């Protein structure tokens, strides 16, 4: 309401595209979206397990300090699945590594037991399967042994859903 009242113009930079007809985006979620989103996700995980939550990013406002804070946390045997191969996922991976969470292949993620925190980053080839409109998402096949799912892949409202809320209880 305040935006309308003050006649503020809002621009969704994510949707500014070239005029060639190809639809290339000029801007997209970048590295810092992945960094901050992952920090906030890990902080929520800490809070959910009744530990003292970390300072919020806007309160710290210093990347070196953020890295220092997250590196002191112990995430035990947490398993994180991450999608995407762009700037946001690279930022997310950067933050997970600062949190001392080890990256493993999807094969190792699914088939091995670890005594430390791990994550796997899967590409579209590994989580999208079919073109005929049927059950195209393979993500739900990976979530049965996943504590946190971080979606960093490009998304469009026309894309099929990776899983539905009704599936969440199946993953427990």
PLM-predicted stretches and their roles:
Residues 1-14, 148-172:
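ADP-ribose/adenylate-binding Rossmann-like module
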Residues 1-78:
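Glycine/serine-rich phosphate-binding loop and adjoining beta1-alpha1 elements at the start
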Residues 5-9, 43-51, 93, 97-101, ...:
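Generic secondary-structure signature for well-ordered alpha-helical cores
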Residues 18, 89-90, 157:
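Short, acidic Gly/Pro/Ser/Thr-rich loop/turn segments
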Residues 22, 91-95, 161-162:
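A short secondary-structure junction signal
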Residues 25-29, 118-121, 166:
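Short low-complexity, flexible loop/linker segments enriched in glycine and/or proline
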Residues 38-42, 93, 97, 140, ...:
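Predominant activation on well-ordered alpha-helical scaffold segments within soluble catalytic domains
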Residues 53-145:
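Glycine-rich phosphate/diphosphate-binding loop of Rossmann-like nucleotide-binding domains
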């Amino acid at each position: 309401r305040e935006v309308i009242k003050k006649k503020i113009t809002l621009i969704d930079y994510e949707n500014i595209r070239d005029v060639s007809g190809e639809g290339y985006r000029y801007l997209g979620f970048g590295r810092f979206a992945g960094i901050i989103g992952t920090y906030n996700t890990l902080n929520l995980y800490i809070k959910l397990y009744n530990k003292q939550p970390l300072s919020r990013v806007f309160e710290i406002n210093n990347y070196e300090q953020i890295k220092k804070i997250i590196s002191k946390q112990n995430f035990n045997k947490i398993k994180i699945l991450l999608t995407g191969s762009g700037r946001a996922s690279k930022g997310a991976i950067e933050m997970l590594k600062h949190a001392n969470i080890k990256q493993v292949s999807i094969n190792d993620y699914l088939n091995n037991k670890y005594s430390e925190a791990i994550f796997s980053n899967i590409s579209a080839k590994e989580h999208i399967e079919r073109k005929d409109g049927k059950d195209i998402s393979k993500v739900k096949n990976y979530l049965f042994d996943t504590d946190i799912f971080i979606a960093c892949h490009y998304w469009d409202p026309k894309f099929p859903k990776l899983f539905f809320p009704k599936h969440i209880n199946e993953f427990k």
